[in-house]
Structures are given as C-alpha cells and as structure tokens.
UniProtKB/Swiss-Prot annotation:
L-isoleucyl-5'-AMP binds at residue 606. This is Isoleucine--tRNA ligase. It comes from the Bacteria. Monomer. It catalyses: tRNA(Ile) + L-isoleucine + ATP = L-isoleucyl-tRNA(Ile) + AMP + diphosphate. The gene is ileS. IleRS has two distinct active sites: one for aminoacylation and one for editing. The misactivated valine is translocated from the active site to the editing site, which sterically excludes the correctly activated isoleucine. The single editing site contains two valyl binding pockets, one specific for each substrate (Val-AMP or Val-tRNA(Ile)). NCBIfam families: ileS.
Length: 960
C-alpha cells in the first residue's frame, strides 16, 4: 500500500499517537496478503543472461523446441549471410533480433520454424585482411602461392564464423547453429558453380568489353553494392572541339567549336564522340569581350545549348557576346568534330550523336563521350560502331601507348591533361583556327563513388568481363519484374525501389579479378573465342567442386574437367572469380526446398541497402535458373545512426557495439530497443536512448514481479468463470483480446512496428496505473475466498501467462525467468504457444463503455489531485466524492462502485434533474477513522472493541 496519512478517531476512542497507530499496523501486518515472490526487482541481466544460455544448452532446449515443432506447418526465414569478418556490429544485431522475434513469434503461433544461419566467406574484405597481415610482415602477396593464400583466407573466415555465432547467441538469437551454411563449404561452392553453369548453358552468360566500376587500389571490378559515396573536390574543365564537318544548309557551323564540360579531365584522351539532345535548342555565339581571367579567345564562335548561355558565359569569363545562329538539336545530325588533342597523337574524328540522356541541367548541353569510361558513353558509341579504346590499366595508370600521359595515374592527370589542352588552344590561336582545347578550368564539390573496403575513389573502366544478360532470349529483366508481382513488401514503398533498380540496371557483371572466391569455372575455345557450353563438362566441374572444393580448379589438369576428346591446349581456362553477390544470391540453392525447408522462402529480411545487393542478386538467380522469386515476402529494416542522426564511425567516437550493451545492460535491453523503434526507418541509438529503454524494461519487469507476487499460492481451483467476473475484470480480459489481435496481425504481415510499445503501454497504463491500483485493496485485504479477490487473481493468472508468452520473442531471458519463477526450471516459456484469450472475452461494446468510464475517471482524479494540493485531503483514501450525473451519464457511469474505481473511502452518485447545470464532482474529507489494516477512512472504524482500529471487512478477515 502506498497511501499514508493521519487517522481520525471517534469520540468514544481517544486520538492515538502516531506511534500507537503504527503499533496497530504492526499488529495486523501479517494478516495483509502482500505480494511474495523470489523474482528479484533488479534484472542483473549481464550476469543472469549467460547463466540462462548455459542452462538452455545443458538441457537441450533448442532440440526440444525442434522436436515440439515437428508435424506443424513450416515457416522458413532464409538468412541473408553476414560477412565473416570481425565481431558483429549494431546493424547485425538489429537485423538478427528482428529475424529472431519473427521466428519465435511464428513458433509460438503454431509453426515449425526452420532457420539456418549463414555466412558469406569469400571476397575482397577477407583478402584485404590477409594482405594487411602480409604487409605488416614485409611479405608480398604475389610471391605467396595462390593455394596457400586461399588457405589462409579460409582459415581467417572460419574463425570469424565461430566468433560471430557466439556473438549472435549472446543476444538471444535462436537458430539451427549446427546446421548452418557458409559459402566456402565444398557443397556450397559446388552449388555456386552449378548456378554459373545454368546461366552458361541457357545462353545468358557471355564475355564482353564494357565499362564497369573499377577499383584501381584493389585492381578489380566492383558491384554497386560494394560502393559508397563521399563528397570530393574535382577539377572541372570546358573544352572546345572544332567542328570539321558542317551538315547545316546555311553553313552555320563553319568555323564553330562545340564546347563540353566534364568533371573527369582524365577521360579526354578516351573521347570518341560528342552527344547532343535532339530536342534541345542550341545557339552559335560569338565572343565579343572577356574578363581578365578568361582564356576564351575573343572572336571565337562556340556552340552551346540556348538554356546554358548565361551560366556558360559566367563560368568562362565571357562578358559580351552575340548570337549568330539558333538551331534545333536534330540539326546537328551529321556534324563531326576533331579531337581537341589532334596533332598530339589523338588523330580521331569525333562525330556528334543524338543522346536522349543529354540535359541542360549543367554544363553546356553537349556531352563528351568516352566509351571506355561511362555506361551511356559505351552504349551510344557501340550503337554507332565506334571503337572502345583501352587506355587505362588495372592500377589506374595510363597504358604505355597513351601519348604524353603514359604511366600517369588518372587521379593525378588533371594538370597534365589541362596542360595539353592549353597547348592545343594556344596553337589554334596562333594559327587563327577555330577555338580548340581548354576554355576554362574550375572545381566542384560533388558526391563520388568509392570502394566501401579501401575507401578509395573508383573509376569506370572498360575491361573484358563476364556478364549475365538482362534482356535477349532469356528475358531475365522482364521475368524478374513479373516475379515481384507475387511478393509482399514491408514496407510497401520498398517495391518501387527494387523494381526501379531492376528496370534500370545494365547486364550483370559477375567477374572479379581476385583470388579468394569461387572461380567462374568455364572454358573458352582459343580459335573462335567462343565459351564452351557443354553440360557434361559442367557436371564434371560441379562434382569435382563438391568433392574437393573450388581449389580443385587451380590444382587439377584441365583434362579432368574437359574429359576425353578435347585437347586442353585448345582452350583458355578462366580464372576470374565470381562476384560475391552472385555467391550469396545462390544461397537459396543451399538448403531451401530440401530438408523440410520451404521454397520459395516465406521471408527474406535485410537492411534497405540489400535492394541493390542480396535481394536483387537472389531474385535474378532464382528467376534465371528456376523461374520464380526465391521469397514470398521481403522485409526491410533501416540503418542505425547515433543519437544525433549521424552515421557511426570510429573517428566520431559514436560507435555502439552490441557487446558493450550486453555487458553493461543486457541483451534484453538491446532487443527491447529494436522492437520499440520504427525499424522501417533509420534508427537511433546511444547512451541516453539505451537509458530510456532500461527504464521501459524496469516498468515491464515490475509488472511481471507484481503479478508473480500477487499470484502467490494461486491454484486452478481458485479461478472464477468468465460469467461470474465483475465488469472490470471482463474489461481487462477484453483488452487482452485486442492485444492478441495486434500480435496475430504482426505475425501475419511481418510488421512489428508499434506492437511492443502497445504492450508496454498496456502494462503501465492499463495495469499498473489502473487495474492493479484498483485491485490492490481486494488482493491485499479481502479474504482468500472473497469473490472479488478470486476474480482478480483469475485475471492476474491470465495476465501472467499472456505477458510471459507475448514478451518472450523479445525479452527472451526475462520472460523465461518470469515463467520459471512460477512454473519451475523444468518448464520453458519458449516451449509454450502464445496465450490465446477465450472467444467470449472479446466484447467491443464493453470495451467502449470502459474507455468512457476511464476517461471520466481521469477527470475525477484530476479533482482529487487538486484537493490533495490544497490540503483538503492527504491521499485519495481520505476522500469522499460525490458525482453528479445527468440522465445520459447515469446510463454509462451509474451502478459502479466509484469508491473502488477512484481508490477513495467513499463515493456516491447524484442524479441531476434534466435542466440542472452540471457542477462537477465534489471532493470532501471522508468521515470516520483510518483502518490500520486497509487504510480506508470509514465511520465504522472503532465500533469493535476487540479490533477498534479495523473496519468491518478487515475484522471479518482477521477473525476468520
């Protein structure tokens, strides 16, 4: 009991002193049924949770759960493999907790849940780590035998698979750990190469020269998902290309130079065309005056888009000009320019070509085309049969055959390229020729792609690579988009993101020029350059990989794979490795559809970056080889930021490691943070936020603790049937049906945002601040056989079972502790099903009435608080309340025990005549004396000579 206050004694009894009243309290203390439980107030989670994990392992809980699930409908969440490199970070924890909650909720909803954790073990990050070790030891990677290097990569990945598994277990993740998959297992490598073979045999796989994202530092192609963007300062240049072929009837382009703007001066040597917009209006302007900083020749005639004239003149220092001609974009068809470095080793004609990608948002409305270094450039030049030069080597330096620039790194080429263009301009001026070369130079700060591993900027570079065709006969793009029509997205907005990426993506470059991975195990006939498409050869490769692993490709004689009748000398054996996104995109082949796992999987759940990564690669592979999407539903979670909304980084000192949280607060706090967040959006975490979660946890724990204490000694025989329950108890049971509906909807839709905040609100607002407060008097002070007390404890039993099972998917350790505190350690809440309210408990009409009652109660408690502040009463139990009710209000609020609901000693209603103004509730000091046992103030206290300090109810209880 929380209320205190001085008592008022009758005229028959002298006013006792405070000490005397306390003596009376002590006399009856043992007759009050106060909560008793061994469930501690403090969780002590950092110490208790590892002990619970050890007990689960010792008792074989995971095996018991698997056994209990057999024969039920199967639910399969296919795990997106994290990279086996370093301890888990907060993003891993977020994702795995979300998966674990969904899995546990399905298990407790009657499903057999199959969840096999996986790891991505190949690729550049692990190579990078081993190379770092070599550099520290003064070793050169190229001097280490390839198979030794691969073995060290394998060992490194294996140790992190084990460490990460322990990290995930520590945060309460339940999975078939002994049945996990890793992409470097021999069986996995065989299935990956089998997937490659399927694309080979259906004609989708081809080798071609195309621009790809290339990391000069790592000397390999990169996938879009391996790219991150950072702001950098780049040199910008305006370059004039003299027009040498004028197709216009009026000779409007005679002596004119077309001007382009670029942020990549290093690509000028690779220029082979200019692009114009067919629907853009262009002008020929004559330069009349320039400022002192401009290098644009006066009198020059320049071609730019009409919409860009003002900006162009400002940026190049042209202060006066006049327009000579205006012409439509399609009027430029057939025009040809000279390369601005003609006469310096670049003897190329530069045709002007129509491009629908050209805009007037920036630059001049004309775009320089370097087909080796841009996707639009490549596609347009290929359409017109223009060569794709190879001028940049894999380390980012110009090749030896590049005039004037050989050996220079492209990121250091701005000055030398500008020097060459300046010489070209000066030569043209000297010869009185059309403007040529550098017209202006500047800088721009913009977002630029970098390798996520090396953090170094990347380039677009045309190299021979292996691709999977998105279009053509297999119609992979079309089929993939169609397959998504049958997929559920959470949130739904993610559908457009994935479909737009597939609509716009180029052919899939799956080759990498690295050592640690699954090789693209194919052969190319040297004479024809054609790839060998032979099912028998492919089958031999798959079987060899299954038995010996991918290393066999590097060890065995090619004849092992080619078989009899083919001379290995006639074939090129390909040693490029496959993109790790192709590997992880193959994982549906590892387990789904076999061993009782569903295919397609019921659910894939990953971060929003996986629309361009695993979600997409998995879809393309599954559709490409099996004709269907590998998933029925896709759930996306946001990224984790710090409390200020900043990205986490060591340099900012704002990194929150899961291990730090579990060691200081406990895994249940971390898990509660996940489910109290809007996981559809980016989340925030930090010390203050975790402190808030700790406070929310404390309230939930206190609710469970009070329930356990109040249920001390409860037996099924004490329970009361629903029909015999008071309306208040029936209302609380109705609220359980509402919450169960919320959970059932979350299980069905995979949308858990808001569910656990609703449960927390129920515990704090409906229970602790309302129902528990009202029923403490009955539970503490009524006789054990009293109908109200029995009814309340009947509901408390349902509340305990409901809250333990409903909280179990999130508070996996605390729910177990609260369950076993009542039912013993031989039982586990994780073997139970969700508590199911009875159908008759669902009473919306009753629920609506009690919402009105609670709203009216809040108005009255406000008046009680006012009376307490002004000294009329000390606590609510010292109050007597009169509630004037209109006829309409009486229909809702009449017939209730308002003293019970308001926790006052007396309350009565007063029916007002129809035309009487409503004066509001009246609060007075209750007449009588304070009962030493229940603390109610009642006139009857003092009537009994044997128990003069008790009320009649308490006398009956202590006398029984």
């Amino acid at each position: 009991m929380t209320e205190t206050g001085s008592s008022l004694m009758s005229d028959k009894t002298p006013d006792p002193s405070v000490a005397a009243f306390k003596e009376q309290q002590d006399r009856y203390r043992d007759t009050v049924f106060l909560p008793r439980t061994g469930f501690p107030m403090r969780g002590g989670l950092p110490k208790r949770e590892p002990e619970t994990l050890a007990r689960w392992a010792a008792t074989g809980l995971d095996e018991k759960i698997r056994e209990a699930g057999k024969g039920r409908p199967v639910f399969t969440l296919h795990d997106g493999p994290p990279y086996a490199n370093g301890h888990i970070h907060i993003g891993h924890a977020l994702n795995k907790v979300m998966k674990d909650v969904i899995n546990r909720a399905h298990r407790m909803s009657g499903y057999e849940v199959r969840y096999l954790p996986g790891w991505d073990c190949h690729g550049l990050p692990i190579e990078w780590r081993i190379e770092e070790q070599y550099r520290k030891a003064g070793k050169d990677k190229d001097q280490v035998p390839l198979l030794q290097f691969r073995a060290e990569c394998r060992q490194y990945a294996a140790q992190w698979v084990q460490k990460q598994a322990e990290d995930f277990k520590r945060i309460g993740v339940q999975a078939e750990w002994a049945n996990r998959y890793v992409t470097m297992d021999f069986s996995s490598e065989a299935k990956i190469v089998d997937e490659i073979g399927k694309f080979l045999l259906n004609g989708s796989l081809y080798r071609g020269l195309r621009p790809v994202m290339w990391s000069p530092v790592e000397k390999t192609a990169l996938a879009e998902a391996e790219i991150e963007y950072h702001d950098i300062d780049s040199t910008t240049i305006f370059v004039a290309f003299p027009i040498i072929k004028d197709p216009t009837p009026a000779h409007a382009l005679n002596g004119v130079s077309a001007v382009i703007w670029t942020t990549t001066p290093w690509t000028i040597p690779a220029n082979r065309a200019l692009a114009y917009g067919p629907d853009i209006t262009y002008v020929v302007l004559r330069v009349d005056e320039t400022n002192e900083n401009s290098v644009v020749p006066q009198g020059a005639k320049l071609l730019v888009a009409e919409d860009r004239v003002d900006a162009f003149c400002t940026e190049t220092g042209i202060t006066a000009h006049h327009i000579l001609y205006t012409l439509p974009g399609n009027g430029l068809e057939g025009a040809v320019c000279a390369h601005p470095l003609r006469g310096r080793g670049y003897e190329y004609d530069v045709p002007m070509l129509p491009g629908d990608f050209v805009t007037t948002d920036a630059g001049t409305g004309l775009v320089h085309m370097a087909p080796s270094h841009g996707q639009d450039d490549f596609m347009l030049c290929r359409q017109y049969g223009i060569e794709v030069p190879e001028l940049v080597q894999d380390d980012g330096r110009y090749a030896p055959w590049v005039p004037h620039l050989a050996g220079i790194h492209v990121f250091k080429a701005a000055d030398p390229v500008c020097d060459l263009l300046t010489e070209a301009r000066q030569s043209a001026e000297h010869d009185d020729a059309p403007a040529t070369g550098l017209m202006a130079r500047g800088t721009v700060r913009h977002s630029y792609p970098h390798s996520w591993r090396s953090k170094a900027p990347i380039i677009f570079r045309a190299t021979p690579q292996w691709f999977i065709a998105m279009d053509g006969e297999t119609k992979l793009r079309e089929k993939s988009l169609s397959a998504l029509d049958n997929v559920t997205f959470v949130p739904e907005a993610a559908r457009r993101r994935l479909t737009s990426m597939i609509e716009q993506r180029p052919d899939w470059c799956i080759s990498r020029q690295r050592a640690w991975g699954v090789p693209i195990a194919v052969f190319v006939e040297k004479r024809t350059g054609e790839v060998l498409r032979d099912a028998a050869v492919m089958q031999r490769i798959v079987e060899a990989f299954r038995e010996k692993g991918a290393d066999i490709w590097y060890e065995a004689d090619p004849s092992l794979f080619l078989g009899e009748g083919r001379n290995p000398a006639d074939y090129e054996q390909v040693f490029d490795i496959v993109d790790v996104w192709f590997e992880s995109g193959s994982t549906h082949r590892f387990d789904l559809g076999q061993e009782g796992l569903n295919f397609p999987a019921d659910l894939y759940l990953e971060g929003s970056d996986q629309h361009r990564g695993w979600f997409q690669s998995s879809l393309l592979e599954s559709v490409g080889t099996m004709g269907v999407a590998p998933y029925k539903a896709l759930v996306t979670n946001g990224f984790v930021m710090d409390e200020q909304g900043r990205k986490m980084s060591k340099s900012l000192g704002n990194v929150v490691a899961p291990s730090d949280v579990t060691e200081s607060l406990g895994a249940d706090i971390l898990r509660l943070w996940v489910l109290n967040s809007d996981t559809n959006e980016d989340l925030r975490i930090g010390q203050d936020i975790l402190k808030q979660q700790g406070e929310l946890y404390r309230r939930l724990r206190n609710t469970l603790r009070w329930l356990l204490g109040a249920l001390d000694g409860f037996t099924p025989e004490e329970a009361v049937s629903y029909a015999d329950l008071p309306p208040l108890e029936q209302y609380i049971l109705h609220r359980l049906t509402e919450l169960r509906g919320l959970i059932a909807s979350a299980v069905e839709t995979h949308q858990w945002v808001g569910v656990y905040p609703a449960l927390h609100g129920f515990c704090t607002t409906d229970l602790s601040a309302f129902y528990f407060d009202i029923r403490k008097d009955a539970i503490y002070c009524d006789a054990p056989s009293d109908p109200t007390r029995r009814a309340a404890r009947t509901v408390l039993d349902a509340l305990h079972r409901a809250l333990c099972t409903w909280l179990a998917p999130v508070l996996v350790f605390t729910a177990e502790e609260a369950w076993q505190a009542r039912f013993g350690e031989d039982d586990s809440v994780h073997l139970a099903q969700f508590f199911e309210p009875e159908a008759e408990w669902n009473d919306p009409e009753l629920g609506n009435r009690w919402e009105d009652i609670r709203a009216y109660r809040r108005l009255i408690t406000t008046e009680l608080e006012t009376a307490r502040r002004d000294g009329t009463i000390g606590s609510s139990l010292e109050a007597s309340v009169t509630l004037p009710l209109s006829q309409e209000e009486a229909g809702i609020f009449g017939g209730l025990d308002w003293a019970e609901l308001l926790i006052t000693s007396h309350a009565e209603t007063e029916l007002l005549p129809g035309d009487t103004a409503h004066g509001g509730p009246q609060v007075e000091r209750a007449p009588g004396h304070k009962c030493a046992r229940c603390w109610k103030v009642l006139p009857e206290v003092g009537e009994n000579t044997e128990h003069p300090a008790l009320c009649r109810r308490c006398i009956d209880v202590v006398s029984a």
